[in-house]
């Protein structure tokens, strides 16, 4: 066993990646709190907050695969089926989850008040977000 920075690690055990503080990104629609974005492990974790009356752009990702978990409020998710072009809309409530696969155009809207949700996804690259409309 080795001691490192007050922690004891067994031989061969990988150390946890330390992150001093979450990164906060202010958006015109609310904000994102980035807990992790790790290219090596292909992993990203954020808390998103969308203010009442606001929405994200209609966009898609070629590489990013996302899962949402609603922690507060209601989230309206508008998406477009990439096979037949049919537009779909659904309302997610606290405790609901939704998985969005790569390539699916989607827009997220605070429905009837502010909304907060956790996004777990593959690694986030700004260049992978393709905006269709604001």
Question: PLM features: residue spans?
Answer:
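A short, N-terminal "cap"/entry segment at the start of jelly-roll beta-barrel domains
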Residues: 1-46, 55-57, 89-93, 132-134
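Double-stranded beta-helix
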Residues: 2, 25-28, 107-134
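Glycine- and acidic-residue-biased ligand/ion/polar-headgroup-sensing regions
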Residues: 63-82
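Short acidic-glycine-tyrosine-enriched beta hairpin
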Residues: 81-103
């Amino acid at each position: 066993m080795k001691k490192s920075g007050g922690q004891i690690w067994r031989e061969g055990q990988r150390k946890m990646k330390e992150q001093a503080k979450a990164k906060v990104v202010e958006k015109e629609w609310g904000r994102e709190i980035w807990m992790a974005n790790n290219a090596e492990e292909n992993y990203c974790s954020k808390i998103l907050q969308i203010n009442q009356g606001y929405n994200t752009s209609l966009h898609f990702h070629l590489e990013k695969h996302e899962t949402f978990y609603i922690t507060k409020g209601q989230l309206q998710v508008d998406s477009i089926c990439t096979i037949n072009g049919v537009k779909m809309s659904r309302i997610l409530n606290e405790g609901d989850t939704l998985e969005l696969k790569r390539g699916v155009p989607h827009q997220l809207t605070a429905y009837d008040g502010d909304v907060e949700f956790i996004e777990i996804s593959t690694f986030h690259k700004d260049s992978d977000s393709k905006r269709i409309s604001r």
